[in-house]
Structure formats: C-alpha cells, structure tokens
C-alpha cells in the first residue's frame, strides 16, 4: 500500500506561494487605488495585468488541484473544521476566478482599454453599457471585500492551527520539502 503524501506537490506549493504574493500585492494595490487618487493611474497599470495573471494561474491551479489530491488533514481537525477548510478553499478559488472576470467585464462595459503590457490589450467581453458597468463595479467591490474576509479567515485558521493547536497543518504547504520525523530511539 503506497504511503500518503504529507505535503502538497512541489508545483502546487509553488503556485500557492506565487499566487499568495500576487494576491497580497493586489489587495494592497486595490486599497491604495481607492484612497490615493494621485497614484491611481500607476496602480491601475499594475492592478489590471496582475488580475489577469491571477486569473490564468487560478485556472492552472484548479486543474492541478483536480489532478493531485491534497494530503490528508491532521487527525486533530474535527469534521466541521475540515468542512470549513474545504469551503474556504473553494470560496477562495471561486473568488480568484470570478473577481478578475468581473473586473474585465466592468472595464469592457465602460470601454476602458485593458492594457496588459505596452501594445497588448485584452478584447472587450461585454457590450458598452453604463448601467452594466455600474453594477459590475459594485459587484467587483463587494467580491473584493468578501475575498479579503475569506483570506483573513484562511490566514487566521492557519495561525490558530500552527501556534495554538500545533498540529503541523502548515507543513502541508510550506515551500520546502518536509521530511518525516524519525522516531525517537527507545532505551
């Protein structure tokens, strides 16, 4: 019988930490865009391509997740905790997919150019419609807040399990390979 993996695959961990850095950057850029109009254009030029990069990576990540089963949860986690962890993971995946699409749709409805880099522009995916733009703009804001709350719950749960419960759940996703502990010698 094959032994169960203790960690996510190296590729899964690479995707996770790359996207975590991108998402933290996106959250900071998003908040700063709203409160600092003097830097708005520079921040938007970061926000748009970063959102599309996140969209592309979440599709890759979701496919990778379907192909590679995650390691088991620690035995210390109750059924309710496992369900909450799975629900928050699915919520994060969903929001990482939907938020960039809503942003793209919002800009399309307003006919704002979606510049990725230099002359590379994304096509419009929705018709020009001011009302649709207004609805999608509100939706983008609400979903961004929901994403931030879900991210905080995810981060808080990891801190709780790492610092309080000490069940080793973070070892499943750390970037480095974790070797199993050798049993202590008996006398």
Where on the chain are the PLM-derived regions?
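Membrane-embedded alpha-helical bundles that constitute the cytochrome b-like, heme-associated redox core
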Residues: 1-187
């Amino acid at each position: 019988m094959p032994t169960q993996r203790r960690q996510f695959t190296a590729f899964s961990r690479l995707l996770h930490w790359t996207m975590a850095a991108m998402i933290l950057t996106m959250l900071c850029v998003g908040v700063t865009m709203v409160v600092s109009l003097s830097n708005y254009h520079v921040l938007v030029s970061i926000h748009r391509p970063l959102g599309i990069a996140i969209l592309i990576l979440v599709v890759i990540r979701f496919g990778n997740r379907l192909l590679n089963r995650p390691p088991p949860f620690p035995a210390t986690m109750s059924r309710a905790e496992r369900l909450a962890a799975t629900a928050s993971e699915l919520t994060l995946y969903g929001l990482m997919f939907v938020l960039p699409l809503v942003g793209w749709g919002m800009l399309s409805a307003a006919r704002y150019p979606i510049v990725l880099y230099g002359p590379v522009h994304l096509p419009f995916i929705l018709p020009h419609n001011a009302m649709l733009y207004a609805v999608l703009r509100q939706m983008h804001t609400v979903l961004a807040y929901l994403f931030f709350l879900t991210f905080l719950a995810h981060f808080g749960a990891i801190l709780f399990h790492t610092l309080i419960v000490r069940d080793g759940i973070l070892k499943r996703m750390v970037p480095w390979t974790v070797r199993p502990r050798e049993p202590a010698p008996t006398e």
